[in-house]
Amino acid sequence: MMNSKCGKAFQQRVRDMIPEMRRVRQIHFVGIGGAGMGGIAEVLLNEGYFVTGSDIMESAVTARLTSLGAKIAFSHAAENIDGASVVVVSSAIRADNVEVVAAQERRIPVIQRAQMLAEIMRFRHGIAVAGTHGKTTTTAMISMIYAEAGLDPTFVNGGLVKSAGTNAHLGCSRYLIAEADESDASFLHLQPMVSVVTNIEPDHMETYHGSFEEMKHTYVNFLHNLPFYGLAVLCADDDVLTELTPKVGRQVITYGFSEKADYRIEDYQQTGFQGHYTVITPSGERIDVLLNVPGRHNALNATAALVVAKEEGIGNEAILAALADFQGAGRRFDQLGQFIRPNGKVMLVDDYGHHPTEVGVTIQAARQGWENKRIAMIFQPHRYSRTRDLFDDFVQVLSQVDVLIMLDVYAAGETPIAGADSRSLCRSIRNLGKVDPIFVSDHRQLGEILDQVLQDGDLILAQGAGNVSKIARQLAETWTKE
């Protein structure tokens, strides 16, 4: 689907329209394997820049970038930035990182990931997707629709676009579709033509000084980065977005299950892991949508993508074909297969959701697609600060599964916080009395424990944003696939 449909002459005209960054020849990424960093690096490699980077471990992302010509070191050292014109960092990189300090001493510009994304977007028709949940999947869906329509977009996503086999692609058209990161408020650097906001919930509150009001105000500022002729596409089902809509001084179009939505979803049904529903447009047109990814949340994601495409003049045929063929985004309800275990057959699903709302919709989709079967979850909390801030919500949502296996918190560089660890979560969940969690301090024991508790027909959710995916996939390699 991602094969270019543009001629060489047109490709050259597009390149001529997009100026090179003057005096920039070598671009260095600190933490190049991180979500979003690798995608930007890939686009820049394909634009002809020399890209270097560093990370603490090898990954599929670093392997791909190396194959494209990037030079990557798997440790942090001052000499890694030798020759760099600019150093790009993500919010996960500390200010005292040796490469950041060396760059500052040498007066090499150090910029946020979103600032580099903004430069890529500057001379393109940008479509930015923000929100607490669903932005990776929505970005992937929009990208696939534009590709199906023959528009060959550039896209930069925070997760793998399965049908493209990558999370980034340099297209030959003027369109750029990008996931916008609110975690450090760096999405304020972007100046797109179209902005989508899927929902707003408290998360990454350290960025917003613990103030949800500040976070909401920042989202309004993000939408005001649109030109006066731009378009804001907002979810009508989200109470916070409904509250903020009157404050947005740009054209707004809404979507959702709400009767007040401009593009309204009706008659959603799920059969197995397939969803189908009808969208009623502002003109009264009825559009029947088929999805091969489950859950009402994915119907919302798909409808956001549909709205963007319809409002930008793409026909129904391309929209519906792309959505029907959509294979999902990496680690979003990713079905790893059905396996034969001592007590019977089980299905293993890998999912990135790490916020209580995300975990909840994943459980709901699993219940609808795996009716009358038990849901077993391997959960790995992500960050002590998130566990602390959303502790009670985690207790409630994790109590909805039938079997709960809890791994240690994936710290992501944070210092442990008393009362915000996995053992504390287990105690509170056990006290609620709905499920008796099993704490596993050494993931090497996970396979043995699973074989003790699993039953024939169980669906296993490997849930979290840390290395639980790697753990689950390594486990699956030792299991017999049906």
Curated annotation (Swiss-Prot):
Associated pathway: Cell wall biogenesis; peptidoglycan biosynthesis
Annotated Gene Ontology cellular component terms: cytoplasm
Binding-site residues, ATP: 131-137
InterPro entries: Mur-like_cat_sf, Mur_ligase_C, Mur_ligase_C_dom_sf, Mur_ligase_cen, Mur_ligase_N, MurCDEF_pg_biosynth, UDP-N-AcMur_Ala_ligase_MurC
Superkingdom of origin: Bacteria
SUPFAM superfamilies, per database record: MurCD N-terminal domain (SSF51984), MurD-like peptide ligases, catalytic domain (SSF53623), MurD-like peptide ligases, peptide-binding domain (SSF53244)
Pfam families referenced in this protein's UniProt entry, alphabetically: Mur_ligase, Mur_ligase_C, Mur_ligase_M
Main location: cytoplasm
GO biological process, one term: cell division
Keyword Cell wall biogenesis/degradation appears in the UniProt entry: yes
EC number: 6.3.2.8
Gene3D superfamilies tied to this protein: Mur ligase, C-terminal domain (3.90.190.20), Mur-like, catalytic domain (3.40.1190.10), NAD(P)-binding Rossmann-like Domain (3.40.50.720)
Enzyme class, broadest EC rank: ligase
Entry keywords, A to Z: ATP-binding, Cell cycle, Cell division, Cell shape, Cell wall biogenesis/degradation, Cytoplasm, Ligase, Nucleotide-binding, Peptidoglycan synthesis
GO molecular function: ATP binding; UDP-N-acetylmuramate-L-alanine ligase activity
Catalytic activity: UDP-N-acetyl-alpha-D-muramate + L-alanine + ATP = UDP-N-acetyl-alpha-D-muramoyl-L-alanine + ADP + phosphate + H(+)
Subcellular locations according to the entry: Cytoplasm
Role according to the record: Cell wall formation.
PANTHER family membership: UDP-N-ACETYLMURAMATE--L-ALANINE LIGASE (PTHR43445:SF3), UDP-N-ACETYLMURAMATE--L-ALANINE LIGASE-RELATED (PTHR43445)
Family per record: Belongs to the MurCDEF family.
Name of this protein: UDP-N-acetylmuramate--L-alanine ligase
Origin species: Pasteurella multocida (strain Pm70)
